[in-house]
Amino acid sequence: MDASTLTSRLQTATASFRSLERQLADPDVANDPKRLETIARERSRLEPLVLDFEALQKLEQEQADARELLRESRSDAAMQELAQDELSELEAQHTALLQRLTLALLPRDPRDDRSVMLEIRAGAGGDEACIWAGDLARMYERYGQKLGWSVQQLSCTEADLGGYRELIVSVKGTSVFSQLKFEAGVHRVQRVPATESQGRVHTSTATVAVMPEADAVEVELDPKDLEISTARSGGAGGQNVNKVETAVDLLHKPTGIRVFCTQQRSQLQNRERALEILRAKLLERELAAAAERESSHRRSQVGSGDRSEKIRTYNYKDNRTTDHRLGRNFSLEPVLQGQLEDLIGACIAEEQRQKLEALSEETDD
């Protein structure tokens, strides 16, 4: 991004920021909680950008002053050295700030701020794949807890020997999608299963889908398209069996998507959860179709959200996690304990690199 384009975009962002500040002082906005929240969130997003732009302008003035001092002190060797040292320091700060601002101005996914629903499905590998799906669920739960996110199980189908055939988890917090979107795809594990008596290494898989939460306005549901039935929630028998039909079985007839919710205490709560999951699934289908229409270059990017992409292998024998998109290895045990910061950070850096490359190609054209 050239200097004039960067300055123009920063000036536009500053103008938007000032406009948002004026709107926040408007009594009509103060009386509209949803609008107030939207404006306040956008203002908070732009504020660091505006402050960095102001710092950049100040640095550029200081650089100009240092160059002037350098010219005026040609006859004073000691002063020349001081002025040159100051100029070098200012130029280093200027370069770092320019890089940060350039990254901040890259095209932004409007879904990055959202909470998500994680759908984890056992893939190839039978019982071991179900156990592996449970291990992945615990990995994400630990990561979410470290970041102060709320992680709640919405729906699950448990397997006979442990783990899950399918699990849907709600993850609520700040900018959850911006990080977990890199987890969508096929996760492969290579290890000796607990069910293996001969000590042989097996390869199993689980698929992760990352669905940004969708509201009722974004995904409209026609009641005629829904088939809803109820059932008693399952249990271990005796007093643990729910005598009231609280479970909800929801079918979206046009797509064939079925959602079964039993986790909540009341039928109404399970119905609301089922509708939330359905909206998220429908939004994911819509986004996947849009991605399919885009170029193959776009789909090859990290974080494209393709649930069929083989993204990672977890090798227990070598204590190694390999991210195939990055071509990098990470220590296995910390990753399984939810220490995903380095891995996800590397994915974010790669996404930024790809966006910068695309921006450079657009500028060249």
Curated annotation (Swiss-Prot):
Q: Could you tell me which PROSITE patterns the record lists for this protein?
A: RF_PROK_I
Location within or outside the cell: Cytoplasm
Q: Does the keyword Protein biosynthesis apply?
A: yes
Q: How is it modified after translation?
A: Methylated by PrmC. Methylation increases the termination efficiency of RF1.
- Principal localisation: cytoplasm
GO terms of molecular function:
translation release factor activity, codon specific
Region (Disordered) residue spans = 290-325
Basic and acidic residues bias spans: 306-325
Q: Which segments does the entry list as coiled coil?
A: none
Q: Which UniProt keywords apply?
A: Cytoplasm, Methylation, Protein biosynthesis
- Which residues carry the post-translational modification N5-methylglutamine, per the record? Q239
Any GO CC annotation of this UniProt entry: cytoplasm
Cross-referenced PANTHER family:
LD18447P, PEPTIDE CHAIN RELEASE FACTOR APG3, CHLOROPLASTIC
Q: Which family does it belong to?
A: Belongs to the prokaryotic/mitochondrial release factor family.
The free-text function statement in the UniProt record for this protein reads:
Peptide chain release factor 1 directs the termination of translation in response to the peptide chain termination codons UAG and UAA.
Q: Which HAMAP family match?
A: Rel_fac_1 (MF_00093)
Q: What is this protein called?
A: Peptide chain release factor 1
Organism, scientific name: Synechococcus sp. (strain CC9902)
